[in-house]
Swiss-Prot record:
InterPro entries: Restrct_endonuc-II-like (IPR011335), tRNA_endonuc-like_dom_sf (IPR011856), UPF0102_YraN-like (IPR003509). HAMAP family: UPF0102 (MF_00048). It comes from Streptomyces coelicolor (strain ATCC BAA-471 / A3(2) / M145). PANTHER family: UPF0102 PROTEIN YRAN (PTHR34039:SF1). This is UPF0102 protein SCO5602. One of its GO terms (molecular function) is nucleic acid binding. It holds the Pfam family UPF0102. Belongs to the UPF0102 family.
Amino acid sequence: MIVGAGGGADMNARGAMGRYGETLAARRLTGAGMTVLERNWRCGRTGEIDIVARDGDVLVVCEVKTRRGGAFEHPMAAVTPDKAERLRRLAERWIQTHGGAPPGGVRIDLVGVLLPQRGAPVVEHARGVA
């Protein structure tokens, strides 16, 4: 492990921050009436879906981005065209391994979590981002 190059305590802190953001995101989604089906679903080297949920008869694949206040990039700006394509591929794989598409289809959402220096976290949910 090389300290200062993304390893060690910094990596643990980022992982903990990401998990905290995903917990806040799951609460936001369930508070909006969705059912969380799975968290951190991995598909080999293809990647991971942060949250898989159901919104009525729609399957929701949700990317969660958590940032500290003052970070360079706002969390809602984090879904690039490449990331959107990867999420679509992951959604297809999840559907294949879980019995097919639901009647309402699939939607890709983004939850951005901003953790300010002081005060409560800010959680934003954008539907149908990709």
